[in-house]
Amino acid sequence: MPTNAFVTGEYIKKVPYWHTDDSVWKANRVRQVLQRNHLSPRLIGEVGCGTGEVLRQLQLGMDPQCLFMGYDIAPEAIELSQTRQNERLQCRLADIRKEPGAHFDLLLILDVLEHQENYFSFLRSMKSLSPYKLFHTVLDLSAQAVLRKGNLSKRRQITDDLHFFTKETFLQSLRDEQYEILDWFYVPRSAHRASGISRKILQLPRKICFALDSDFAARLLGGYSLFVLAK
């Protein structure tokens, strides 16, 4: 069984800022989903909330009466969240599946599924916690990623991902557990993270390919992530 680097403290050694640099664009995309689907949640929960920065960014741009509750099993992440918490935003060191009475209008599950040893069991445990679940995952599986020797192994070592998805396998995993897909869209993650000459060179062919066929671009060149709203 893989060692849980989030609990042992190994993860923060590799990612000391706990992905806070991704928080603004993630929060913006969450708001985009809410607007697209005419949702106005009053209580938002997040599984694997990390430092709580996504919730804080959401709070800054949403109804001031909205409440936010985050859960994480990593002590270091919750410690970092202390400066972001306030009267309407709380983060707990806890496994949400073991929290009595946990229920929300919207549950955020952002970059979590790929870390679950048994993600089907995890999906089943999320069903009763909220009528709406918003997922995000990086689409690591692409032809380009597979052809580059050691690419996926390196990502697993850095991010502790246990599973890698395409759009098709991710959506099918949700359907296998009786989730109803309400909305989904790609996000050009590579543009947000473009650094270094090789990554920047790939931006133009990705954009051209994506404009012609988004599914083909994601499968061939990668560099995209996926947001999915489900019931």
Give the residues covered by each predicted segment.
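A structural motif corresponding to the C-terminal end of an alpha-helix
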Residues: S173, E177-Y179
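Activation segment
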Residues: P100, Q116-E117, L174
